[in-house]
């Protein structure tokens, strides 16, 4: 009888931990899926955009390592805090509009 009393809280703890693990797994899958857009373009990845921004900063400044770090951190922060537009798609649409000319 004593084993039954001890096993019930352990079972509840295991069920709680299982639910937490499933929740974490769903969150990670959602974040991974949102990292690269459905169109499959690499430039839609916020990490890559930050890395490219860091590369540009590194080319403009002498300290390449600092530029990479600042650009990558800035890209990650911006992607998490703001709705970052898809620059590649916007530029492509704009260039197509310019090629067509006025209606």
Swiss-Prot record:
Membrane association type: Single-pass membrane protein
Designated name of the protein: SLC35A4 upstream open reading frame protein
Gene Ontology BP terms: positive regulation of cellular respiration; positive regulation of translation in response to stress
Entry function: Required to maintain cellular respiration.
Domain of life according to the entry: Eukaryota
TM region positions: 62-84
S-S bonds: none
Keyword set, alphabetical order: Membrane, Mitochondrion, Mitochondrion inner membrane, Transmembrane, Transmembrane helix
């Amino acid at each position: 009888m004593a084993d039954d009393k001890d096993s019930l809280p352990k079972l509840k703890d295991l069920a709680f931990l299982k639910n937490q693990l499933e929740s974490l797994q769903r969150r990670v899958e959602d974040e991974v899926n949102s990292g690269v857009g459905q169109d499959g373009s690499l430039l839609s990845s916020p990490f890559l955009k930050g890395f490219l921004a860091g590369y540009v900063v590194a080319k403009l400044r002498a300290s390449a390592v600092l530029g990479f770090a600042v650009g990558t951190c800035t890209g990650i922060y911006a992607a998490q805090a703001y709705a970052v537009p898809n620059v590649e798609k916007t530029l492509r649409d704009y260039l197509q509009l310019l090629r067509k000319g006025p209606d």
